[in-house]
A protein has these predicted regions:
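Short, small-residue-biased leader/transition segments that mark boundaries at the very start
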Residues: 2-9
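Histidine-centered catalytic/metal-coordination loop motif
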Residues: 13-77, 143-200, 213, 225-228
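Secondary-structure boundary elements
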Residues: 75-87, 129, 195-204
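Charged mid-protein connector segments
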Residues: 80-134
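A short glycine-rich, hydrophobically flanked beta-strand micro-motif that places a catalytic Asp/Glu
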Residues: 86-92, 205-213
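Short terminal or interdomain "cap/linker" segment that borders an active site or interface and mediates
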Residues: 102-107, 125, 214-240
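Short amphipathic
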Residues: 136-140
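Structured core elements
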Residues: 159-161, 207, 219-221
Length: 240
């Protein structure tokens, strides 16, 4: 776990999807499932992805009476580690679970013809344009940062929903690109984006959601909001 300071936000969570879950039934037969874990943002600790993967792997040769027993064990352990109740939902592959892939209902800004030369977070790039109050959703596939522990690249789609003065889209895209050489955890990057937008664009309402590509059978999808927008559903981004 890693201690983290969080913004005081009404609605936020980190949603993890796990695609490589397995354990043994009482007869020693392997069982497999997919899982969804919801970690509240007010937890005093965040769960580091590599250690989470090692924890999940520890189930591979452990016998359990049922999927419910596995779920209860994970919920107990993860809640104790995070310091707040962690939601756990497992689906056995034998139950034929389904998952949807889609794009946000919003405006993709990646095709803007911009010049980029900043590759560390540059919040001073953010600005608004003159105009009436708008409510819109902007998104980009160009968010890339690096894992704070391993230095490996983290790739994500980031979705920004807000109400307020129009955010300059070219400036926003340059800002997103500026994370390219930045070393920080997924959750911290999303919180940084949220706080920078709050400070420099001062929207009346704001939500920032990122869906990161999976590594080691896990993907992380942080969500930060002022409370004016609901938690998004678990629709996968195409690279997930």
């Amino acid at each position: 776990v890693t201690g983290v300071q969080t913004c005081a936000l009404p609605i936020c969570e980190d949603l993890w999807n796990a695609y490589e879950l397995s354990w043994l039934n009482p007869k020693g037969k392997p069982m497999v499932a997919v899982g969804c874990f919801r970690v509240p943002v007010d937890s005093p600790n965040l769960i580091e992805s590599k250690s989470f993967k090692l924890y999940l792997n520890s189930f591979n040769h452990t016998r359990f009476e049922s999927l419910e027993a596995v779920s209860a064990t994970m919920a107990r352990d993860l809640s104790a580690t995070a310091g707040r109740p962690v939601g756990v939902a497992l689906q056995a592959l034998s139950s034929s679970p389904t998952a949807s892939i889609g794009s946000p209902d919003g405006i993709l800004i990646d095709d803007l013809d911009i010049e980029c030369d900043r590759y560390q977070p540059a919040p001073e790039l953010l600005t608004t344009r003159p105009g009436d109050i708008v409510e819109e959703t902007l998104y980009s596939h160009l968010l890339k940062s690096n894992c704070l522990v391993t230095g490996q690249p983290d790739w994500a789609m980031v979705v920004i929903r807000y109400r307020g003065r129009p955010i300059d889209r070219a400036a926003l895209l340059r800002y997103i690109v500026s994370f390219r050489n930045h070393n920080e955890f997924h959750e911290q990057c999303v919180e940084r984006i949220f706080c920078d937008l709050q400070a420099h664009c001062q929207p009346q309402a704001l939500a920032v959601h990122a869906r990161y590509t999976r590594r080691g059978g896990l993907d992380i999808n942080p969500f930060r909001s002022t409370g004016d927008y609901p938690t998004p559903d678990n629709t996968r981004e195409i690279r997930q």
